[in-house]
């Protein structure tokens, strides 16, 4: 198996009391977490987010990105829905790791955008791997997702892995003066849909 289930516990948060499920990735030893709320194994599409770790945004309140605000918005949305899943993947810096992310930030301080910085360091613009998502969702009995993301490439990547994405739910939040170039680059070079004109996209049944 690509991932091994370790344990589950309660996780009280300001938004709701989630169940926290821990997994270890067999090939790398990375530890991943899934938060779930309500009955997600009833066969109906589940509101969910696949969120890659961002220490600076999620824990240190960085305004260089929109990651922390997206994480909070996703947890709030799941709590409001009363049902959902959040996959928290340990793929810092779109897969390049924390120290390389800081190196990329240094290049961005000198004028590079987020894609150019990755490429100057010898990395692809996005090095994340979503193959581990399917077995974690299968463990929880999730058959279909209403995926909170602005990234159509993420939808395609998950679909290519055999995950049924019934709908893309936009997640527009966290814009500020410090991340305007970052968000513009995600839209222009990484294909993210950042505008309000795309309210939702329903995929094939």
UniProtKB/Swiss-Prot annotation:
One of its GO terms (cellular component) is cytosol. Zn(2+) binds at residues 54, 65, 67. The keyword ATP-binding does not apply. Pathway: Cofactor biosynthesis; riboflavin biosynthesis; 5-amino-6-(D-ribitylamino)uracil from GTP: step 1/4. Binds 1 zinc ion per subunit. It is an enzyme of class 3 (hydrolase). It catalyses: GTP + 4 H2O = 2,5-diamino-6-hydroxy-4-(5-phosphoribosylamino)-pyrimidine + formate + 2 phosphate + 3 H(+). Its cofactor is Zn(2+). Signal peptide: none annotated. Disulfide bonds: none annotated. Gene3D superfamilies: GTP cyclohydrolase II (3.40.50.10990). Its EC number is 3.5.4.25. Keywords: GTP-binding, Hydrolase, Metal-binding, Nucleotide-binding, Riboflavin biosynthesis, Zinc. GO terms for molecular function: GTP binding; GTP cyclohydrolase II activity; zinc ion binding. It holds the Pfam family GTP_cyclohydro2. NCBIfam families: PRK00393.1, ribA. HAMAP family: RibA. PANTHER family: 3,4-DIHYDROXY-2-BUTANONE 4-PHOSPHATE SYNTHASE (PTHR21327:SF18), GTP CYCLOHYDROLASE II-RELATED (PTHR21327). Catalyzes the conversion of GTP to 2,5-diamino-6-ribosylamino-4(3H)-pyrimidinone 5'-phosphate (DARP), formate and pyrophosphate. This is GTP cyclohydrolase-2.
